[in-house]
């Protein structure tokens, strides 16, 4: 069992779907039957209903009991004691470290989606850590949200989207990709961000004309937030650069991504170009503050060791005071 993942869900939340997806063997300590049913229901909804599950209660005691079945077949489990789940997922751990999910894997409908190559670069520029809190503002189909959730396996991703159709697509894509640390926030930024935890990384795919307000809101929550934006127009790119200059943020990195894909035409192949996209990224810094002469807290007094100071380095007043 040295290759099994050990997870305790007793009194805390864990992104169990991601753990199951990444490992062939998972031991999970759970609190009660209701929590077990919730886990089995979510596994079934996320396409893992046929994964083998063993539920052990009162282990090592005379009344020890172990039930074995698939997640789907055990949906109505009724035991009430503290239990251990042992989950065997034969396809666990087969996903690449960097997701790079093909475009046709996502359910799209009529909602715009960040394409695969641009998405991979944007995710890399976000510099997401495993326990990161990530915002995807204007999430669309949730393609960025899903890949971010695959990287931040111990964190949480918040997909902010106002359109009902897109909200349902995000939920569907989260289920298809087995990520349960992705949360759909219904509404428009910046108002929809108010109750969310402070972000480590923010991707902005759409701002509905409120770009500056969104940037102000996320920087207020975390002055050191990492930001990545996708833009089609020069005007949007210039807006971002103007904002970084006016707010004394480090200079933004701007790259243009122009992707062409081979397309078969008869017996030949020709390159079919996609629209070029600007990928803009920067790490926020707190705005510099002018010292207020009326506020003592704006000034720092430096302690001086007088034994290390030569008299000729001092002003006359200080020398006079010391030598008295």
Language-model features: where?
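Class I SAM-dependent methyltransferase SAM-binding "motif I" and its flanking Rossmann-like core
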Residues: 1-22, 190, 248-272, 276-278
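A contiguous loop/helix-start segment that scaffolds small-molecule binding in enzyme catalytic cores
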Residues: 25-110
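Core SAM-dependent methyltransferase catalytic element
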Residues: 85-87, 267-294
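Conserved class I S-adenosyl-L-methionine
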Residues: 131-140
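Conserved SAM-binding loop of SAM-dependent methyltransferases across substrates and taxa
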Residues: 141-153
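Conserved SAM-binding motif I beta-strand of class I
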Residues: 156-161
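S-adenosyl-L-methionine
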Residues: 162-199
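Conserved beta-strand signature within the Rossmann-like core of class I S-adenosyl-L-methionine
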Residues: 224-232
């Amino acid at each position: 069992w040295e290759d099994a993942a050990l997870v305790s869900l007793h009194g805390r939340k864990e992104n169990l779907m991601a753990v199951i997806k990444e490992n062939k063997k998972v031991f999970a300590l759970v609190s009660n039957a209701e929590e077990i049913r919730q886990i089995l229901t979510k596994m079934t909804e996320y396409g893992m209903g046929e994964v083998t599950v063993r539920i052990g209660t009162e282990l090592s005691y005379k009344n020890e009991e172990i039930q074995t079945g698939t997640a789907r077949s055990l949906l109505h489990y009724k035991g009430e004691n503290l239990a251990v789940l042992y989950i065997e997922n034969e396809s666990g751990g087969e996903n690449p470290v960097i997701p790079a999910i093909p475009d046709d894997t996502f359910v799209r409908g009529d909602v715009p989606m960040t394409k695969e190559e641009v998405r991979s670069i944007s995710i890399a520029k976000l510099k997401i850590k495993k326990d990161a809190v990530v915002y995807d503002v204007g999430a669309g189909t949730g393609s960025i949200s899903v890949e971010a959730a695959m990287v931040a396996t111990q964190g949480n991703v918040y997909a902010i989207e106002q359109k009902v159709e897109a909200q349902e697509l995000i939920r569907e894509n989260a289920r298809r990709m087995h990520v349960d640390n992705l949360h759909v926030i219904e509404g428009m930024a910046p108002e929809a961000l108010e109750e969310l935890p402070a972000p480590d990384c923010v991707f902005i795919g759409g701002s509905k004309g409120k770009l500056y307000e969104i940037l102000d809101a996320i920087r207020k929550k975390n002055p050191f937030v990492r930001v990545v934006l996708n833009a089609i127009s020069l005007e949007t790119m210039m807006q971002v650069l103007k904002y970084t200059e006016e707010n004394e943020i480090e200079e933004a990195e701007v790259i243009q991504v122009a992707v062409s894909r081979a397309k078969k035409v008869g017996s030949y192949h020709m390159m079919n170009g996609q629209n070029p996209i600007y990928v803009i990224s920067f790490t926020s810094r707190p705005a510099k503050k002018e010292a207020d002469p009326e506020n003592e807290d704006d000034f720092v007094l430096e302690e001086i060791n007088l034994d290390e100071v030569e008299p000729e380095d001092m002003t006359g007043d200080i020398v006079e005071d010391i030598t008295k």
